[in-house]
């Protein structure tokens, strides 16, 4: 049975020896600050799973819409959805991300996220 041993709703994150289904974990969405919204009515949700030596691992999700952000040092893997990430740095091309995309962001990078299908990712930051 593939889900055996998985904790369906880890309220306080994961404890050693437990797991969760990252694709179906229920998340609580909140509206983005109006100053960050470029278009639409996007919401985001975050669910920290573990803190490992000062590095946080968790699940983040954004609904369709466009929003600006200032990034933190992070690597993430897209689980579901689609988006385009535009960078303020003219030397960096826009990134189209979809399931399986692995992306590295740096502290202080300014971005604009255009989500066309609710985007869910696992982040390490």
Predicted features and spans:
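A short hydrophobic beta-strand segment most commonly corresponding to one strand
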Residues: 104, 117-125
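Short, conserved beta-strand element in jelly-roll/cupin
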Residues: 71-85
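A generic structural motif
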Residues: 86-88, 114
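Short acidic-glycine-tyrosine-enriched beta hairpin
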Residues: 90-107
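Conserved short histidine dyad/triad with adjacent acidic residue
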Residues: 51-71, 107
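Short hydrophobic/aromatic-rich beta-strand segments that constitute the beta-sheet cores
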Residues: 69, 85, 121-124
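Short, charged beta-turn/beta-strand-edge "cap" motif at the junction between a beta-strand
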Residues: 109-112
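A short, N-terminal "cap"/entry segment at the start of jelly-roll beta-barrel domains
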Residues: 1-58
């Amino acid at each position: 049975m593939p889900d055996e041993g998985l904790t369906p709703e880890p309220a306080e994150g994961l404890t050693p020896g437990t797991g969760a289904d990252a694709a179906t974990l229920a998340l609580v969405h909140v509206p983005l600050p109006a100053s960050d919204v470029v278009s639409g009515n996007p919401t985001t949700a975050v669910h920290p799973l573990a803190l490992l030596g000062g590095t946080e691992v968790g699940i983040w999700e954004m609904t369709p819409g466009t929003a600006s952000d200032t990034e933190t040092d992070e690597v993430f893997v897209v689980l579901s959805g689609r988006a385009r990430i535009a960078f303020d740095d003219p030397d960096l091309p826009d990134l189209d991300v979809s399931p399986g995309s692995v992306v590295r962001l740096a502290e202080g990078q300014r971005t604009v996220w255009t989500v066309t299908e609710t985007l869910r990712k696992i982040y390490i930051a």
